[in-house]
Structure formats: structure tokens, C-alpha cells
Amino acid sequence: MPEQDLASGFLLRFQNARPVCLSVGSFVSFRTVQPRKMRDRGWRCVWHRMAGVGALFGIFGVLCTVEAGATVAAPQVETGPLLSVRAPRSPLHLRDVDAPEVTHASSEGSPQFESSLSQQRLRRPADRGEAHNGEEPRKDAATQTVRGYGGQSTEPPPASIVPVSSEAPQDGAEQRQASSAAESLAGLDPDAGDTGLRSQEMDEEGSGAAQDMERAHAAQPTVSTWDDAHLVQVSTSHPDMFPVDGSFSKKQEGRRERRLAVRGDDSFARGHNRDRDASNGRSILRRAPGWAKIAALATGLLVSAFGYSSYKHGGPRVALRIHKLHLKRKLPISWRRYLNNLPVLDERLFPEFEDILPWLRRGARLVKRVPHVSEALADFIGLDEETRRTGIVIKVKSSTDAEARRLVYEVNAHANMVPDNPFFLPIIGAYQGASKRAVYMILPRARADVADYVRARPYDVDVRLAAAEMVYSNYILHTHGFLHRDIKAHNYFVTFDGHVVLADFEGVGVLQQRTPVVGTRGYFAPELSRATDHTEKSDVFALGQTLKRLVKYMRPTVRVPHLRELWALTKRMTAKDPEERPTLKQVMEDPYFDGIDFERLEAKDQGVPFRGDFSIDDPDAGGKMYIPPSKEQDHEQENE
């Protein structure tokens, strides 16, 4: 059928092209993940290579699946009753070989052969005497009459019956024997005079061989070999199979797909075992069960996906940590779905949002402090008595043409990633506006950020205790496997009890995670100017810069205790070489913090770093809205 011909041709071409596909896939995969930056030196290169190996597994799994489908679609060889092939007038005395029913193999335009059934049958040696009826056989071997089991005679085409194996190649002895047989068949002389005598001798020997084979098959289980070797009928005029001089060239003898097999009964079984043991990957794949192919494909895809994830995130440990967060639902797989699951807040129902809506344009980010919350909004978001008294902060992000991840990443970081600790600013709630124009975060209000508080009330600040709480909050974040990546004085806030809390988790990331560089100019570590990732040492550098700015914000008339030790510590923390910077654990053990017990710091019983009742907000019901400055304005403020 045309469909079967198409499937057979596709399978043959695919099997020949598979090594090329694997070679090209190997080269592309390894070149794609080859390190191109100085940051990729060291152990990360191993996981770059792992991504390539995983890609190879994936490619091989896909190829195996396609080949398996093509094998199923290819025409199946049906085997009929075992018949005996008789080579007339051969100068080499050969034993009879069992063969199934065969058909003419198409040799025009392609060396590919078809193995479907034909209507012509070869007769067995036991039927020859009855078929001839005492007559001499014809001298023309090409037009000799062949009788089947039913006694019906047919005229075979001018062709030679040659057993061909599609699996493992023969050894040298079998090839020489097959070549000699082919030469004898190709060099027949139709005009020889001893045709009758030779035919009669071969009839007798063939009958004895057939009886021996029947007894052998009855004594031991029959081994079916027609899955690995089958017979095809090839035209003697084919230039590749039968050269003009009647002999096979060395190239033709060594060709795997055209191996000749002339065996007896027991040698036939031994040849089947040799073919089975020496089978290549294609035969193993065809004999493999379906579940094994599916498992190989799934394994390849999993290894490829994990290799790519390790390369993307910066290593296998980071990839496993991120996938673990996915499984624990602390890191959403779909940010759009996470955004759509946020509760809806109707801005028209609450007076706190009246002056926010006019500012909602593309890319707008607003922060509004609300010292006095209306009863309607307090009941809607479920505020407790203390928060109703101190007020809230509404952080607004415009959703016009904005990515879902940028809108809700900080929401998820506050809710799921940041540990529950008194030195972190908690989140009250997150909502999407009914107008679909913004996402709102509700946070508890603080007195001010550290920078503004130190500028306004420098005499009410205990610098060493404030620095200790700032270092400890960052240390807790690192111990839970996260980086802040935007440490600065404006991201530390002073609560109403006078202690420090860390906020603004929009840039928080997993330790050693490969992500774009974020932060504020003036706090960037020197290594971030190159193609590298955030590390714990980059947060240490930013924290050292923050402590330096904290001292600079103090007025010149204010005396700072232990200033010499503080400058020595900040100098170590801001070293250009990341290897020379201390870890946060070493920072807490520095002589500057002698007398501070970090294990009891969470109890907040060692003093208050920010004394007084200073608040940056005006005590009006509407609150004061703060629009964050641009990066250029923020940089100018930091350099003042």
C-alpha cells in the first residue's frame, strides 16, 4: 500500500539520519551552554554541561519515540509455511534452507526491498517426484516451473531467491560461503548436459534433508527467525547485487543490509542466536516494550528540564530550592493566576483611594501613609486595634501594561518567602482594584525610615544598637536562603516601639539565584558591574555602605560612640574583593558589637535604638502621599 511504502521509506531514512541528528544535537547543546563570561568559571560549568547532556537525552527520547511510531506504521512481514529453496545445477553442493513465502523486491530506483507476501510458492523436495511425473526438468533455470503445496504450477520471474538479513553482519567465513553460493547461482549455464542427473541427485538429498529437519524440529522447540532475517526475491539484473562479472565485490560482501545467509537446520538456529546477540540499537528498540520507550522519553525530558533549570538559576542546589518552594506553594508557578486570585477592592467605596486614582498611569508607583483609617476600610481589611491607632501604608502599583510578576512578586515575598520575625515589616493584605488599574498592598505604618529619622533626630539614636538590629535582620534573611539585594537606609524603617524592621522585598531572591541585577546606585558591590550574580557578599557590601551613610547622616556635633571600631568594620565590609569581606556571622562577632547578645535580640530587652516620638507624617485624616523619586533624584539625595 502507498501508506506502508511511505512508512517504510521514512523509517529507513530516519534510522540512517539518527546518528547525524544526535551529533548535531550534541554540538548545538554543548555550544549553547558553553560559558561565555568570567562568572561562569568553576563548578557552574559542570551544570552548564549537564544542561547539554539533558538536552541530548531529550533529543534521543524524541527520536526513539518517532522511530517507534514509524516502526509500528511500517509493513509487517508475515511468514507462511516453511518451504525449501532449491538452487538448480549449482557446482557447489549446498543444503536446503527453509524460507517463508516471499514476493518480488522492488529494485528500481532504490536499494530498498519489500518483504510482503507473494502469491508464488516454492515447492518442497518431497513433492518434486510427483510434480515432474517422471519427466526431465527443464534446462532453462530462469523459466523453470515451481509447484506449491496446492499442486498449482506457476512461472516465476527471472530472479534468484536470496535470503537477506536486516540485522547484524556476518563473519568472514559466512560471507565467503555466501559469496561462493552467489557466484555459483549467478554463473549457471542453461545449456549444460547433466541437468537431469544433477536434479535427481538434489531431489534425493533434499528429501533426506527435509526429513532430518522435521525430526530436529520435533525434538526441540522451533525458533522463529523471520523477524531478523527474511527472504527477498531480487532481480538478477540489479547492478548492485549481481555485478556483470558474476562475482561480488568486497564492498558488496561487507555491506550489512545485503548479507547472504545459507544455513541448515541447526546452523539456522545458531545464526539466529548470533543475530540476536549482535543486534544493534534499532533491533533492541523495536523489541523494547512500550513502557520502556515512554520511560526513556520521560527520563530524558526530566534530565533536560532539570539541567536547563540548573543552568538558568545558577546551580542544582538553587534549582532544587526553587522547585521546593513551588511544591510548598511559596512561589507560584503562574504569576497571572496568582494575580487573578487576589481579592478585589472597590476604590470608590473608601475615601483613602480618592486621591490615588488620578495618579494611576502607566508605570506609576505610589506610597500613601494613612495615619487615621476610616471605619469602612478598617472593617474591610480586618485591622486590629493597635493598627487602627497607628495607621497603615498603601503601596500602589499601576497594572496598565505591566507584567503580573512585577505586580505581585513583592506581595508573595511578604506573604510566603520572608520568615515570620519581629525585624521584618509584615503585610496586612493585598488586593487588585475593581477598576483593573492597580494592585494595592496594605502595610502597617512606621514612624519613618532610618535615614529620615537619623536626619531629623540624631541625638535620639543609639547607632550601635540600631546597626546590630540592621545586621541581625539581614542575617535572619540569609539563614532562610534569601537575599534582599536592595539593602539601603531607606529600606529600614523605625516602628512605633523604636526598633528597626526591614522592608521593601520587591527584589528579594533565592541565594545564588541567577537573576537580573537590582538595587540602588551607591550600594552596588563592585563585582555587580560585571556579569555576575548577587551573593551574600553583595548584601554585606550594601549593608556596609548603609552603616557608613548612617554615620554621615548624623550631625557633626553629635558624638558617635566607638566610631573607630565602626569605621574599621565598614571598611572590611566594603572591600572590593568579595573574598576579603566578612560574612554576617563574622560581622556580628566583630569587637564593635561587644556587649550585644544577638541571641536575645529578638526579645528586644537590650534597649531601644530610636528614642522619641518622631513621625514623618502630618496628623491629618487624609494622610500624606509620598511619590518615590526617580533613580537620578534618589542618587542625588544619597550624595548630599
From Swiss-Prot:
Region (Disordered): 100-222, 237-280, 609-640
BP-aspect Gene Ontology terms: intracellular signal transduction
Biased composition (Basic and acidic residues): 124-141, 248-279, 631-640
Gene Ontology cellular-component annotations: extracellular region
Pfam families: Pkinase
Function, as annotated: Serine/threonine-protein kinase which, at the tachyzoite stage, phosphorylates several parasitophorous vacuole (PV)-resident proteins such as GRA2, GRA6 and GRA7. By phosphorylating GRA2 and GRA6, regulates the formation of a functional intravacuolar network (IVN); IVN is composed of membranous tubules that bud from the PV membrane into the vacuolar lumen. Plays a role in the establishement of chronic infection in the host by controlling cyst formation in the host tissues.
Disruption phenotype annotation: In C57BL/6 mice infected with knockout tachyzoites (type II strain Prugniaud), the number of cysts formed in the brain is severely reduced compared to infection with wild type tachyzoites. Parasite virulence is not affected. In vitro, the ability to differentiate to cyst stages is normal. In BALB/c mice infected with knockout tachyzoites (type I strain RH), virulence is not affected. At the tachyzoite stage, loss of the intravacuolar network (IVN) tubules which appear to be replaced with large multilamellar vesicles.
One GO MF term attached to the UniProt entry: ATP binding
Listed name of the protein: Serine/threonine-protein kinase WNG1
Keywords, sorted A to Z: ATP-binding, Kinase, Magnesium, Metal-binding, Nucleotide-binding, Secreted, Serine/threonine-protein kinase, Signal, Transferase
Active-site residues, record numbering mapped to chain: D486
Chain intervals with Polar residues compositional bias: 104-120
Catalytic activity, as annotated: L-seryl-[protein] + ATP = O-phospho-L-seryl-[protein] + ADP + H(+); L-threonyl-[protein] + ATP = O-phospho-L-threonyl-[protein] + ADP + H(+)
Record organism: Toxoplasma gondii
